[in-house]
């Protein structure tokens, strides 16, 4: 398939490379040109504008937030000249309100639109092992299936209205953030009682919580380096979006408010550029523990 790819951040580079490796014809655009150099060396075609990525069978958008998608897609009016049989696949984590707006914009333009946010960190994207949360017209999803198969290990169908996939992603990210917060607090409690937090995490991930989320983020909390795979600022964005989605439907999310406030606390202490698991430092400060575990 001829596919455009917009957004070559930490996730997008790995995803675009997987498409190239699967022998799709990939045309890329990124606001700053430097990130595209790696995928161009691998065989992608560099485009000079977002519209250049909207000339084939499909176009994938993997940008950071509502504003970035709005600027690249609506601001550049790329749908006006796109082929009518093109499928636009938005894989960004967006607000529900903006996802609904995109539904209307695409319907007016006569362009098929799928929301397909993903689960997984950059290393998972590079390995082609993402989980894809897809919603939209079933026929359009089937047309996109070869692309999803190249990028992910499984595609989960969550509804016929694209914004349903965005709601699912926000719910999952809220749950993941809650798990990180709970592990951080549990580790701080154990350490104050002179229990080795690494040993506690070994028990946690080897018994009742033997799941990838706990294993991955438990390890990051214990190592204490917090190299960014998913930045604190993006985690804060997603908690705000989850709270807004809940408010719109009268669904309280009190723990999301706690996590949001702790992410704000971490950013206020200079950790904005670190992985969102660095929220563990907030629990440590409040427990009167110094620094990160391995940095002591």
Language model features: what each stretch is:
Residues 1-62, 86, 122:
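NAD(P)+-binding Rossmann beta1-loop-alpha1 motif at the extreme N-terminus of oxidoreductases
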Residues 162-286:
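Helical "substrate-binding/catalytic lid" subdomain
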Residues 72-74, 93-174:
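Rossmann-fold dinucleotide-binding core
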Residues 26, 46, 112-114, 155, ...:
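Hydrophobic beta-strand scaffold residues
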Residues 50-112:
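Rossmann-fold NAD(P) dinucleotide-binding segment
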Residues 15-16, 35, 102, 147, ...:
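Hydrophobic residues within alpha-helices
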